[in-house]
Each structure stands twice: as C-alpha cells, then as structure tokens.
Swiss-Prot record:
GO terms for biological process: stress-activated MAPK cascade. This is Mitogen-activated protein kinase HOG1. It comes from Hortaea werneckii. Pfam families: Pkinase. The modification Phosphothreonine is found at T171.
Length: 359
C-alpha cells in the first residue's frame, strides 16, 4: 500500500505518494494545479498535476476518464508522456508526467525566435499532430502554452483534456480564441483534424512575427480580423454554415480579397510563407494535412519520412457517447489506473529479465 504525504501549495492540499518530494508550484493546467517534484525512484524531475474532485459530477468524471485514456494511449516523442497516475485518499487524481523547463508561450514573450528554432519547433508540432491524428484524435486546444519545450529544444504537446474523437459531426466551441479555426466559429456543427492545422498555422505565424496573428477581442471581431487577411470565405464554405444568425453575420461582412501573406511577413523566408499559405486556408478540406506539411520544402532540414511514425492503432472512443453515473466512471477509472501500473510493472520486469540475460 502506497504511503501518502500532504503538502500545502497555494492553499491547495497536495496529497501524494512519498515517492515524490520537493514540490514547487509551476502553474495552473486546464483543470488543476501543476507542481514540479523530484521522483525518488528515478531521481528525475517530474510534473505533478492535481485534478480536483474528478468524481464530483458525471461530466467531470467523463472528462477526466477521457484525458487518462488518451495519456495512456498516446505514446510519441512529441506528446507528453504519462509516467505515473494515482488517486489519493481524498479522491483527487494526480497525473505525473515528465517535466519540461518552459513552454512556447513563455519563449515567445521573452525574445524573438531565430529561423532554425522556428523550423525545428514547427517540425515537431506537425510530427506530433501526424501521430495524434492517425490515432483518430483531434487535440482541439492547440496554443503556445500547451507546447512544452526543454533546454535541448525537444518539444511536446500537452493538455489533452479537451481532445475529442475525429467525428464529422463534432460540436461545441473550445480552443483559445486566437488559435481557433474558422469552422468552429462559423458552423458549431462539424469539424475534424484540420482545426489543429489551423491552430498550428496561427502558432507558426506567431513564431515568425513575435505576436498573435489574429488577436480578436470576441468571436465577431476575431472573424473580422481573419477576413481582413484571408479575404471573405468562399461560397462553398459559407454554404456549410448551419446557424441562421451566423450566416446572416457572414453575409453582412464587406467582401474582402485575400492578402498575400508575404506583404504581412516582410522579413520571413519565402518558403515559410508558402507553407503558412497552405495551413491558413478557410476551407478545411483544402488545408494541408500534417503528414503533407512535414514534407514541405521549408521543413526539409528536419524531415525524415522513416522517423515520423503514425499510431499503431486507433484510439477507442466507444465510451464517449456513454451517459453513465459517477460510480461507474469511478470503477472504470480505477480499472484504467490498475491496468497502467500492471503494464508498467510488466515492462520493467521484462527489461530486468533482458538485462539479466545480457549480463
């Protein structure tokens, strides 16, 4: 039985196993406080995220279960890696991942990025997205603060709390406004993996320019700013709008022509502009795919088709339409955590056996 210890962080009780020491607050995640800690087992620095009261409502239980399942399933160099997970006696959940020193938002607010860093960061974002999308997952909330970076410039995408199934009927409204794809704002009816490519394009533009490309004050202003640069949406995109109010709003806007991006980004590499043009396209069906973008000439210094893996299997979304009581989600969550620790223990045992044989 694990021994739990308590610590007070910003007035919040962290109740964690004695394996983790030296807790220091590093920020707030989407649904909880994040601390750095030292893992006594591995001597590595880790991030510990507290998800408060995951069993308080069926909606929160389901969301927590979804993030847990995703973190278990997604295993890739450019995706944050789950190293431990447990539920405390107070029934809060703690998710332990590797700790990276900073995030892209902090980097962008501290100094302009040199060309080779912009290329390398964009390459890693797209490499991660190629894998995520091949698993049948859409991140939906890609933004600079969800992109973690270490001192070696290794990059990892995090915060899959809002991620959803690839579904042509996907609904709702999610990501931070500046990075939100127009089809989310326009239709509220259906969107797919292309929303992440739009977000990545906005992040790419911000790396080139040093400031957000579309800093809208609200949804209406956001869309207006987008059309100033990219022009009025084509008729076949407007035809997909389901909401009468949204349709009237779009039709009321003055007709605008798409502006050449090279006029906006005067100092940027022409190849960077060409790739950005392929990412920031109104029609999601014509937006470049992650795998195609990786093969773009701009990313040639890093592109290696033999080292840009796809997921071995699709993520199982069968639970996603379930409307279950808290107690059922709780049993399912405990089952997933037990499975994670069993798989982990078996992998360690296999590695130990191999070492013994090799020795």
């Amino acid at each position: 039985m694990a021994e739990f210890v308590r610590a007070q962080i910003f007035g919040t009780t962290f109740e964690i196993t004695s394996r983790y020491t030296d807790l220091q607050p590093v920020g707030m995640g989407a649904f909880g406080l994040v601390c750095s800690a030292k893992d006594q087992l591995t001597s590595q620095a880790v991030a510990v995220k507290k998800i408060m009261k995951p069993f308080s409502t069926p909606v929160l239980s389901k969301r927590t279960y979804r993030e847990l399942k995703l973190l278990k399933h997604l295993r890739h160099e450019n995706i944050i890696c789950l190293s431990d997970i447990f539920i405390s006696p107070l029934e809060d959940m703690y998710v332990v991942t590797e700790l990276l020193g900073t995030d892209l938002h902090r980097l962008l607010t501290s100094r302009p990025l040199e060309k080779q860093f912009i290329q390398y960061f964009l390459y890693q974002i797209l490499r991660g997205l190629k894998y995520v999308h091949s698993a049948g997952v859409v991140h939906r909330d890609l933004k600079p603060s969800n992109i973690l970076i270490n001192e070696n410039c290794d990059l990892k995408i995090c915060d899959f709390g809002l991620a959803r199934i690839q579904d042509p009927q996907m609904t709702g409204y999610v990501s931070t406004r500046y990075y939100r794809a127009p089809e989310i704002m326009l239709t509220w009816q259906k969107y797919d993996v292309e929303v992440d490519i739009w977000s990545a394009g906005c992040i790419f533009a911000e790396m080139l320019e040093g400031k957000p490309l579309f800093p809208g004050k609200d949804h209406v202003n956001q869309f207006s700013i987008i059309t100033e640069l990219l022009g009025t949406p084509p008729d076949d995109v407007i035809a997909t709008i389901c909401s009468e109010n949204t349709l009237r709003f779009v039709q009321s806007l003055p007709k605008r022509e798409r502006q050449p991006l090279k006029n906006k980004f005067k100092n940027a590499d022409p190849q960077a502009i060409e790739l950005l043009e392929r990412m920031l396209v109104f029609d999601p069906r014509k937006r470049v795919k992650a795998g195609e973008a990786l093969a773009d000439p701009y990313l040639a210094p890093y592109h290696d088709p033999t080292d840009e893996p796809e997921a071995q299997e699709k993520f199982d979304w069968s639970f996603n339409d379930a409307d279950l009581p808290v107690d059922t989600w709780k049993i399912m969550m405990y089952s997933e955590i037990l499975d994670f620790h069993n798989v982990d223990a078996n992998a360690e045992q296999a590695a130990h056996n191999n070492d013994t044989v090799a020795g």
